[in-house]
Curated annotation (Swiss-Prot):
Induction: In response to low temperature. Negatively autoregulated. Induced by cold shock (42 to 15 degrees Celsius) (at protein level). Sequence repeats lie at residues 364-414, 439-489. Keywords: Cytoplasm, Host-virus interaction, Repeat, Ribosome biogenesis, RNA-binding, Stress response, Transcription, Transcription antitermination, Transcription regulation, Transcription termination. One of its GO terms (molecular function) is DNA-binding transcription factor activity. GO terms for cellular component: cytosol; transcription elongation factor complex. It is found in: Cytoplasm. Belongs to the NusA family. Residues 364-489 are annotated as: 2 X 51 AA approximate repeats. HAMAP family: NusA_B (MF_00945_B). Residues 230-293, 302-368 form the KH domain. This is Transcription termination/antitermination protein NusA. Changing residue 183 to R: In nusA1; restricts lambda growth by preventing antitermination activity of lambda N protein.
């Protein structure tokens, strides 16, 4: 028998290119399983094979626990120490028992367990082999094409999957085609796909530029951000760590060779290379190219920017189906509102008039004083109530007592408005989890509550169309808030 075990280990190890120790472990598990089937009760068995001789011993064992719930597999600490005083909780008490002989049933059981363990070992090796390549471009040959995905043969018994959403639109592959993509996920699953590859995520664009532009690999040029409408258009932001080098020109290449190579790999995707700037407003101006920006107004509190362009440039600035401004927004991380110069001016005039009306109504001041506050950049009661006092004292003609009185009136007004809101809502008040969601201020929370959206769970069940006409809430922001709520409520992400 010992020679048979050693022969099996050697044969399987060579055939599957697996370490001998993995095969020994699989055999031990198989023999333990076969032994358990000889007993009517459920027991715990351990088999130990001598790695040199092939001989094996079998042990029945009991886990040392505080309270026994499975008498055939567990033993109390007191009883265990009766035999061995050195034992502790979590240790095992073992008795050697008769080892199984290899009859037909035992052989079949052992074979099934070995096959399963070998398969698990092969899958573990694939995970170990590719985990260090996560985030890199890999190449495979199309093995099978399904409706929802394609399978890639990567060699060495490794397969990857490209899901339909990770392909470019109108991209079709046939068995035998060579395909490149970024390995974005390595999952140690017991069944199904383990390696997931994408061609549509921004990481694919970044890695292709890393291959085509040596300066990126040398860290002379740095890719700061990327945004894609896969297969159609993309924007990538670059900066240089060496002022002698033009990062945009280096990425474009001689006669556009470098950017063209990337574009060709991505099905002719048009790529805008944008110069990174640490100033968010200037970076957004760069990202809006090829459109020329006439002026830009930044609202840091709401993390939005109003972008004004000449009327003749409006269509170009927005792009087909909003593509240009959407990509610029994704690239910069800011919510961008594009309009004509006249529209921006009219918007700011309307906002100024609204702020003046609010100040005169709630602060008991005249229109001239309210106008001065607006011209100095104050537009809400919250700003007047909570900005540092020194900012208000910088306004000509205001002294400390006046500022104190103004701040006190603003705080009282906010309290009055909040109380009125709560009374008007009745029982429909925003819950703490909604108020604490990033991106939801108190005003928006009460607007949502007025629609019956009072909790994160309520928000998670909404669609963008359900929130479309809430003042100050864009479709993009509504979608982001809904997804954030779903991630927390449905998938257990932290707020």
């Amino acid at each position: 028998m010992n020679k048979e075990i050693l022969a099996v280990v050697e044969a399987v190890s060579n055939e599957k290119a697996l370490p001998r120790e993995k095969i020994f472990e699989a055999l031990e598990s198989a023999l333990a399983t076969a032994t358990k089937k000889k007993y009517e009760q459920e027991i715990d068995v351990r088999v130990q094979i001598d790695r040199k001789s092939g001989d094996f011993d079998t042990f029945r064992r009991w886990l040392v626990v505080d309270e026994v719930t499975q008498p055939t597999k567990e033993i109390t600490l007191e009883a265990a120490r009766y035999e061995d005083e050195s034992l502790n909780l979590g240790d095992y008490v073992e008795d050697q028992i008769e080892s199984v002989t290899f009859d037909r049933i035992t052989t079949q059981t052992a074979k099934q367990v070995i096959v399963q363990k070998v398969r698990e070992a092969e899958r573990a090796m694939v995970v170990d082999q590719f985990r260090e390549h996560e985030g890199e471009i890999i190449t495979g040959v199309v093995k099978k094409v399904n409706r929802d995905n394609i399978s890639l043969d990567l060699g060495n018994n490794a397969e990857a999957v490209i899901l339909r959403e990770d392909m470019l639109p109108r991209e079709n592959f046939r068995p035998g085609d060579r395909v490149r993509g970024v390995l974005y996920s390595v999952r140690p699953e017991a069944r199904g796909a383990q390696l997931f590859v994408t061609r549509s995520k921004p990481e694919m664009l970044i890695e292709l530029f890393r291959i085509e532009v040596p300066e990126i690999g040398e860290e002379v040029i740095e890719i700061k951000a990327a945004a894609r409408d896969p297969g159609s258009r993309a924007k990538i932001a670059v900066k240089t760590n060496d002022k002698r080098i033009d990062p945009v020109g280096a990425c474009v290449g001689m006669r556009g060779a470098r950017v063209q190579a990337v574009s060709t790999e991505l099905g002719g995707e048009r790529i805008d290379i944008v110069l990174w700037d640490d100033n968010p407003a200037q970076f957004v101006i760069n990202a809006m190219a090829p459109a020329d920006v006439a002026s830009i107004v930044v609202d840091e509190d709401k993390h939005t920017m109003d972008i004004a362009v000449e009327a003749g440039n409006l269509a170009q600035a927005i792009g087909r189906n909003g593509q240009n401004v959407r990509l610029a927004s994704q690239l910069s991380g800011w919510e961008l509102n594009v309009m004509t110069v006249d529209d921006l001016q009219a918007k700011h005039q309307a906002e100024a008039h609204a702020a003046i009306d609010t100040f005169t109504k709630y602060l008991d001041i005249d229109e001239d004083f309210a106008t001065v506050l607006v011209e100095e950049g104050f537009s809400t009661l919250e700003e007047l109530a909570y900005v540092p006092m020194k900012e208000l004292l910088e306004i000509e003609g205001l002294d400390e007592p006046t500022v104190e009185a103004l701040r006190e009136r603003a705080k009282n007004a906010l309290a009055t408005i909040a109380q009125a809101q709560e009374e008007s809502l009745g029982d429909n008040k925003p819950a703490d989890d909604l108020l604490n969601l990033e991106g939801v201020d108190r005003d928006l929370a009460f607007k949502l509550a007025a629609r019956g959206v009072c909790t994160l769970e309520d928000l998670a069940e909404q669609g963008i169309d359900d929130l479309a006409d809430i003042e100050g809430l864009t479709d993009e922001k509504a979608g982001a808030l809904i997804m954030a709520a779903r991630n927390i409520c449905w998938f257990g992400d932290e707020a």
